[in-house]
Amino acid sequence: KINLDQELKKGNFLIGLKQYLGANVDSLSGNKKLTFETKNNFLTLHSSNGVKYKAKKINILWQAVPLEIPYTIERLVFGPFASYESAQKKAIRLKEEGYNPQIVYPKDWEVWIPVEKELPSKKLNYQLFKKSYNSEIVPFFVDEYSEQKLEGPIYISSDDEIIINGVSVGNQFYLAKDSYGTWTLIQKIEIDDYLKGVIPHEIGSSSPLEALKVQAVI
């Protein structure tokens, strides 16, 4: 089973590289397709619904799949805020008042809370968001012979550097559904690689190991 929480518990880093995949604002897979490829070694794909595939090139296509039962989402939206820190302050105040806030970034920093039976006072300066959905964005593995529906999280890895739509990034990735009904590309970086690569670049490779570890946590 693919479990992102387990990766975090192991001390690995999960970095969101690109959000809103499959949506109209998707700038990475604007043609609704992600291509993962390597120059030498094979790629391996594992989907949460049991689909497994191994090749030097993997195509994932986003499709809007009709729902048998449409659903409606309601939430109260605060913002937009100029920065994450401003949104965080608002979220803290809402939590102190007994609400369950979520800090998000669909286009700007916002704070969302669920709609309850009694709406908060308008003095809190929020907007009511309500939207009905009759389809969902679903990833499909496609090749020249067939296509297979995938379920997230999806894990894609290789011993080689992986090229995604022409851009070389790393060699371990996840695709996971987000709070907006779209998908996020997440890079997995193991703690040892982070200490050897990113952190020495930030504070100097000659720094003591303990200092590097502290910087990684920060």
Regions found by a protein language model. Give the residues of each.
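Conserved, single-site charged/polar hotspot
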Residues: 1-218
